[in-house]
């Protein structure tokens, strides 16, 4: 089972997500915004309002939408680019 430790916005509906194993994956959610809970995420300014909820170890939005960390890991593509601190949410200080 995976969990999200950090996430940053790239562009469109793409996020760069770091998981507990330090694997960084680029996740494109553009094809996964079906259903009433995900409808608000189609609005890019709203989509960009995600945070990392460390109680459930995944990315969440203000309306309660979230994706399973295992699903995010599965659909993500490995990425060697560093996560830029200014754009990152979720790090514990």
Place the predicted regions along the sequence by residue.
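Motif-centric detector for short Cys/His coordination patterns
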Residues: 1-93
